[in-house]
Amino acid sequence: MKARTPKPGRPARLSRERIVETALNCDLRTVTMRDIAERLGVSHSALYRWVGNRDELLDLVGEVVVERILPTAEPTADTWRPWLTDLAWRMHDQFLAVPGYAAHVALPHRHNAQAFGRLRNRVVSAFKLAGASDDLAEQSWYIFGQGVVQWLGARQMGHDLGPDAPRFDLFLGVLLRGLPAREPGS
């Protein structure tokens, strides 16, 4: 997504980075553009010169979070499971570090196609390296993504997962032992 540039005039007090950093410290479930402008000490109309609306703001936040969670190394046929484990723990740490982010991502909505597309492509690639067909790699991505995001979202929203709810490490271990998805009976 191309960042907007401010109109000519006074030197900018805003930047994409300042806006995103401010948003990363707000509860993303409830934050408004007016809240962000107030925290930045600018008018909300000045903020709109940089970010068109709340959805665009959340897209920018998604780009930063996905950049933070993607491991620098690519998965291989020998490392796909540890790679996915590392990715899931990065998701755990980053999604829960941003107030309301895991809860936001867990709700049905339009995700940032570019950022989440990069995440999806890397995870699908890992499952293909594990021997999954194209279709089963896509199915495995869905199971992995939904499983991790829903667990994190429920935790962040304060839903009681019950007294016997598994710790994230146990949940992740069981999830990854069942992936990549396989055709029934195979």
Describe the function of each predicted region:
Residues 1-2, 157-186:
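C-terminal peripheral helix-coil segments that are non-catalytic and often amphipathic
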Residues 2, 7-35, 39:
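Short, amphipathic alpha-helix enriched in basic
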Residues 27-28, 41, 48-58:
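HTH DNA-binding helix-turn interface
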Residues 34, 43-46:
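Key DNA-contact positions within bacterial/archaeal DNA-binding proteins
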Residues 51, 61-62, 141:
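DNA major-groove recognition helix of helix-turn-helix
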Residues 63-69:
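Short, basic, alpha-helical segments at the C-terminal edge of helix-turn-helix-like DNA-binding modules
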Residues 71-101, 106-109, 144:
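Hydrophobic alpha-helical connector segments
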Residues 86, 106-143, 149, 153, ...:
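Amphipathic alpha-helical packing segments from all-alpha helical-bundle domains
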